[in-house]
Regions:
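Extracytosolic helix-loop segments that constitute the early lumenal/periplasmic catalytic or substrate-binding loops
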Residues: 14-18, 30-58, 62-65, 69
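Loop-to-helix entry region of an early transmembrane alpha helix in multi-pass inner-membrane enzymes
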Residues: 61-65, 73-91, 122-126, 256-260, ...
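Membrane-interface alpha helices of multi-pass inner-membrane proteins
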Residues: 109-110, 154-170, 180, 201-204, ...
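Hydrophobic/aromatic-rich transmembrane helices and adjacent perimembrane loops
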Residues: 123, 282-325
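Membrane-interface transmembrane helices that cradle and orient dolichyl/undecaprenyl
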Residues: 1, 139-157, 165, 184, ...
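Catalytic lumenal/periplasmic loop and adjoining terminal transmembrane helix
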Residues: 333-448
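Transmembrane-lumen/periplasm boundary regions of multi-pass, lipid-linked membrane glycan transferases
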Residues: 21, 33-42, 66, 173-274
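Transmembrane-helix motifs of polytopic, lipid-linked glycan transferases
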Residues: 9, 83-103, 138, 142, ...
Length: 465
């Protein structure tokens, strides 16, 4: 019992320690908070989730429905997403323990989840892929027992977890393909029940999207069919594999990453060959890992860190199925790599501007300026200029924030948030182009790294006939 408590407390520690002053409120997080704020102020839930980077299509709005109770409970503070995500994981772990009775593997899973850099980072900076791992684990375990001994309960758990995971992030789709290949090779039973259950899950979790499509003459579907997706394909197989390995093991040492990867491939093939007749959990985990890896390599998109979760979950499961001695050695080695002081301290460092500083600065501005404004940002650490995190805070603090793309002409002022940088006459970007000619109206200093510059539109004088 004490082992369970210690490991769960370790997991919680890495998610919450020094969170108030170290969480980095930025871009996608601000986008999500802005959607939730509009829901709160307008009373209507969103029908679409976040837009995907690989396809011109949106994820399910279920993501926002998961975040909304915490958003209300924390009075709009973005840290609510971290607590929602933490609770989601803990409930997922509890569900696995109670339903599948896998206490020993679960402790290893929670421990490795606790210390893996990508999981810590993406649990302290929450967006839609952050919720995948518990759902993926549940789907993996339930599918194993489903194939071994079919039951309607396991089918319901499997279809619900995998369809919700894919609805939250399409990066979970390769795992579903791997499930199908495994079923095709080793089961081939109850196909109609599988398909009906999966279809029902996708329909349920994407019902808001379907409502949007019906209302807007299938706008997203037409966009998906006729608009070319962003060109993300990297046809260099070694480069794609290196990206996967780097994000999967996250040791910051390419040589160590490749060594562990090759070791895993050898062990996975060993499990598959050694258990080819009884097909126990080691065989099952290894088969899914290799199959999902191959599918990920063949997909026509660049492999980004947010796509790592299906492979990462399977990697941890393969480790949990190792024989006792090599399992202990590998866990100790990964612990040494992941818990080095330089890595450990990086999770808790204070950003160049804290949320409290941003909130105080925007609140002061909104108290003094009551005209409608557009918002953009000039930053030193990214190239985005739409600034959803700043639009959220300004709107939350009472400013009349307009959208430069949809409401152009409804404001004569633009607030440029200088986030570690300065707006100089030689700088230009899309939002400034839309705004037009301008002159500086007022400067609002807040901190050495975070300031506000209000600019005013300059209209050309009318020409005489």
């Amino acid at each position: 019992m004490w082992k369970n408590i210690v490991i769960v407390l370790l997991y919680i520690f890495f998610r919450l320690y020094h969170l108030q002053n170290s969480f980095f409120f930025f871009n996608d997080w601000g986008r999500d908070m802005l959607v939730l704020l509009k829901w709160q102020q307008g009373g209507l839930p969103p029908l679409l989730g976040p837009l995907t980077s690989a396809l011109p299509f949106n994820q399910s709005a279920v993501y926002f429905y998961l975040l909304y109770p915490g958003f209300l409970l924390f009075h709009g503070h973005p840290v609510s997403s971290v607590f929602t995500c933490l609770l989601f994981y803990l409930l997922g772990f509890y569900f696995i323990k109670k339903v599948f009775k896998l206490n020993s593997p679960l402790l290893i899973i929670i421990f490795l989840f606790s210390i893996h850099p990508q999981l810590i980072i993406q649990n302290r900076f929450v967006w839609n892929p952050s919720f995948l791992p518990p759902l993926l684990l549940i789907s993996i375990f339930s599918f194993y027992f489903l194939v071994k001994n079919y039951s309607s309960t396991h089918l319901f758990i499997f279809s619900s977890s995998i369809t919700l995971a894919i609805s939250l992030s399409y990066s979970a789709a390769p795992l579903l393909i791997s499930f199908f290949i495994y079923w095709l090779l080793f089961s081939r039973k109850f196909i109609k029940r599988y398909l009906l259950s999966l279809f029902s899950g996708f329909l349920l979790f994407n019902l808001p999207t379907l409502v949007f499509e019906i209302r807007h003459s299938f706008f997203l579907t037409k966009q998906l069919l006729y608009q070319s997706p962003a060109n993300q394909f990297n046809n260099n197989l070694i480069s794609r594999l290196s990206s996967i390995i780097s994000n999967l093991f996250s040791t910051n040492n390419p040589g160590i990453n490749w060594f562990i990867f090759i070791l895993f491939i050898v062990i996975a093939f060993y499990f598959i060959w050694h258990q080819r007749f009884n097909r126990g959990l080691p065989f099952y985990f290894s088969f899914l890992f290799l199959t999902t890896l191959i599918i990920s390599l063949l997909l026509p998109i660049t492999f980004h860190y947010q796509y790592i979760f299906p492979l990462l979950c399977l990697l941890v499961l393969v480790i949990s199925s190792f024989p006792r001695f090599p399992k202990i050695i590998l866990i100790l080695f990964l612990s040494f790599i992941y818990l080095r002081p330089s890595v450990f301290q990086s999770y808790f460092k204070t950003p160049q501007r804290t949320y409290a500083q941003m909130d105080q600065c925007t609140k002061s501005f909104c108290q003094s300026f009551k005209e409608p404004i557009f918002v953009s940002t000039q930053a030193s650490f990214h190239t985005f200029h739409n600034g959803p995190e700043h639009r959220y805070l300004l709107r939350k603090n009472g400013c009349q924030v307009k959208d430069i793309e949809t409401d152009n002409g409804q404001a004569d002022f633009m607030l440029v948030v200088e986030d570690g940088s300065r707006l100089t006459p030689d700088i230009n970007f899309y939002e400034l182009d839309l705004f037009g000619k301008y002159q500086e109206y007022k400067y609002y200093p807040c901190t050495p790294q975070f300031n506000l510059r209000l600019i005013e539109k300059v209209n050309d004088p009318p020409t005489s006939n």
